[in-house]
C-alpha cells in the first residue's frame, strides 16, 4: 500500500506529539495546543507543528516543560495594538534559563514563500508584534526557527533583509531600542535614530552575515 506524503506527515507529527506528551503529562494545556496543531486541517499549520515538534525531539534538554512558559497564544496587547489576532509559537521561561530567548517562532516555509515575505502584511505584522512585546529588549530575545529541509538559511536572511529595507520606518519605530545594540554604518557609535537605521539597511555592505540576522536559526 502506498502512503501519501500528507498522511505520512500526520503520522510523523503524532509520533513527535506523543513523545513530548510522555515527558509533560502534567501540562494538559500545552498538550492541547500541540494536538490542535498536529491534527489541524490546515496543511501549513500542521507542517509547522511537525517542524516544531521535530525540533523539540532533537533538543530535549532545551524544550522541557520547565523551560516553556506558554504555547500558541495571542500577544499581550501593545500600546498601538499592532495585530490583534497575531500569535506566538513558544514563550520561554528565560528566568529559569537565561540562555534561552524569550520567544521562538517556527516557520516551515519553502524558498518561494520566503521570497515573498517582504510584501506579506500578515507576516510583517506578526514580526512587529514580537518586536513590541514586553520583555523583548534586544534581537536575541527572539528566534525564528526555519525548516532547513525546505529553505536555505541564507535565503531566509536575504528575505528578512528585504523586509527591513522595504519596511524600514515602521519596523524601526515599533521598538527603536532593539536596534541600539548594532553599530552605525560609519563606525561612529551605536544606532540611535531612524536615519542611522536607514543608513545601515541601505548600505552596500549590509548583507546576510550581519549580526542583526542572528535571530534566524535553522533546524
Predicted regions and their residues:
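Short amphipathic alpha-helical segments that mediate assembly, nucleic-acid/protein binding
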Residues: 26-27, 49, 120-124, 139, ...
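Sec/Tat signal peptide C-region and signal peptidase I cleavage site
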Residues: 20-24
